[in-house]
Amino acid sequence: MESVESAARDYRETLAELRNNNKTQINLLTILADDFKKAAPQIVEVIERHLTTCSPSQKLLVMYVCDSILKNVKKPNDYDALFARKIVSMFEHAFRQGDERIRTSLYRIRVTWASTTLFMPSKLYELDMKINKLDPNWPISNPQTGRALRDDPQVMAPSQSRPAGNATSPAASTSTNRVFVNPKFIGSSTPGAASASKTVVEKTKSPGTVNKEKQVKKEPKQDPLDKLLPSSSASKTSSSPAGLKRKSAPSEHPNAPIRKKPQQPPKPQTAIDEDLRSISLTKKPPVPSAQDQDFRPKTLKPTSVIGSHAFAPVAAPIRPMIPVPPPVSVAPFVPAPPLSSAPPFQHPQQHHPQLPPPPVHQGMGRGYHHNSPPQDPAPIVPVQAPPPQQHLPAPENVYSSEQPKLDVPANNRIFVDGKAYEVMFVDDTAVIERGGAPHRIYFAGPPRNLVIDGIPHLLQFDTPTQIDILGSKHMVKFGAPSRELYIGGHPFKGQFGGPPIIATINGRRHEIRLTGSAPEVRIEPEPAYHLTHFLHKMREEKKIEIASEKPEKKEDWLSYLKNLRTRNILPAPARSPSSPRNQTPPPANLPIPGMNNAGQRGGYHNRHQPQQNARWGGANKQQNIPPPPSDPSPIGSGVEKRSAPPAAITDFNIRLLQIRYDSVVDALITKRADACKFCGMRLDDSQGKSKEWQDHMDWHVKQNLARHGSNNSAAVPYRQWYPSTSTWLTPRASDETNEQEADKPEEPLPGVASSGVKTKECSVCGEKFDEYYDDDEETWRLRDTVNVHGKIVHSACASDAARSLDNSSFFNDSDIKKEEPFD
């Protein structure tokens, strides 16, 4: 008992530390819940209590913790059953207290529950009914599937359901695929109710087999998108009763006209009393029809759901019920135009779209016109309809993608052992050429989540998976570098963990994200010899692509010739003899009409401008400014130039480093006033007046003295260029001394033991000594110090200390001699 209480207390303290959407803390809470499975009731109670007491901004975080526990804790556990009892009240409380952003996030959590088996569909239906009372825009899930999508064809709002009176009719023409939402479903979803409904269905199917077959014919199976496409559903429902009436009517003559009657609402099945003896069981051959048929594709009316036309199944071609044409002597008709003026025969698909659609009437009374030619024995070529067995092919899915802005260079190369290989594709197989043979490459690793419009789908690498995208099935699989994803055989380029892929599927935009980091790229060790004959073709295609990508350098011959003329390499054009000489030159500041500021007309240089300037003699030669040399284009030189880099750090990109900025170059060249002129170190703007400047300059002086030595020292800081006479005459001795000096071990830095030193400052320079511990002698010493006549000074200050001591001893001796008395 104590362990359970301590586990609940620890979990309460850890949950109270959750302040923001931190994935690490949420994972920690999930791991704790997995470790404390025995205290599952207490932990669920702690989570519920914290949800009701925390601030509204943290309620979403608590729901994230619940979602993580439900999805990640190992089975079996008691959390699923415990959360199922309280999830409706917890979700409703978080939804009621949250703002629009929190409600959107809660909806995303609810969508993920629909694709898993965490809760029963009835529980999700109860949750949706609760939230729908708070927000009418909240979609209600299907009690059978649990999906909470608004465009689910099996979902219908409660307001669209029919009244209870019509529901009691045994022959109500309802679709078998639709599920009408009833708020009383929760109370009625019991085994007893299910058995009762089963008996009712058996009773309705009990009348004879003939009525059962007629019922199947009378109630065709409707499409799930009938509610979205009212035009198609209306045409289907209006054609079925007419066919039944035609079948029940006695046929007196095979060519007798069948008059259409006004449509009536379908009667219940029990009200139809029909003499089965009057029905002919022999199937009569169809009467050839000469009436024109409209083969134009049916236009879909606009619907409330965007993009629903793309997923509407193509219905089989329905042959319209064409009445048999009456005899010529009985039924009047409008004669067709003569055959001489009629256009030549064309294919039905090319000819009939030009004709107006035939008028639809309730009967064949007045005003009925027939568009077919008269039925006479003249040989007229009838319009052939497509055979009954020929069906139009189903429309193929259309894919297109928008290139995302990736943070990686757009090339198809991979590096293996420091060597770059070009990735080539044979259909959807990625290969590289290695050792003259093709090797297949592919992604490998654990399964990844592919998020399509916020819905995750778990995919295995190198294994195609069928995914339902808005009612349409698509084969999706991971690809290879530069073609990371395939949907329906169409490649998409993306980045794992990067920006989303914007794909247009059947006219509707979708956002696709590749989650996680970049997967491992594996290379098959065995060459794919069956792809060897494709290598030459792929090489040629790659050369063509590279050649097409190279920009064509435009040569400006006009500016080149002008530069030659300004350098007096080319002679000036001959002056026209008819040109007037005594003309006043135009003002220099007035522009010539039709020219822009650059001296161009319509985008090209004016060829007559130098000739016009030459007419005014030498008085205006100084005003003739030669055209400036054209700057090299960024394409030709390969370097783009700009004035200044972008100011915002968020706009920075790796490609911006390839651009030459004039402001950056000027800043690097310009001499800074706040930098040291010797080393370039940046200091303050006091121009040498602050203590920082003075200390820095003193440091330079000390470095120079230590490097070159003082003026009084006789040591030479550098080696002489030419050897001296003694060194030249005795080379062996010099070599031996050099060898002896080289053999000497390096002496440690001199240092005086700090135990007996009273003042740890140099008596010459006044700086403090650096004290260190000597491990060899196990004592504390003063670094780089020497003892000069009882005074501890730096090694560099030893000469100055000795000189000062000699001077002081000389003065002391002279003073002593002066004080001695004379004998």
UniProtKB/Swiss-Prot annotation:
Residues 3-135 form the CID domain. Residues 200-226 have a biased composition (Basic and acidic residues). Residues 374-390 have a biased composition (Pro residues). Pfam families: CID. Residues 157-176, 188-198, 609-624 have a biased composition (Polar residues). GO terms for cellular component: cytoplasm; mRNA cleavage factor complex. GO terms for biological process: mRNA 3'-end processing; termination of RNA polymerase II transcription. It comes from the Eukaryota. Residues 227-242, 342-353, 571-581 have a biased composition (Low complexity). Signal peptide: none annotated. Residues 142-176, 188-301, 340-395, 570-643, 728-755 are annotated as: Disordered. One of its GO terms (molecular function) is mRNA binding. PANTHER family: PRE-MRNA CLEAVAGE COMPLEX 2 PROTEIN PCF11, PRE-MRNA CLEAVAGE COMPLEX II. This is Polyadenylation and cleavage factor homolog 11. It comes from Caenorhabditis elegans.
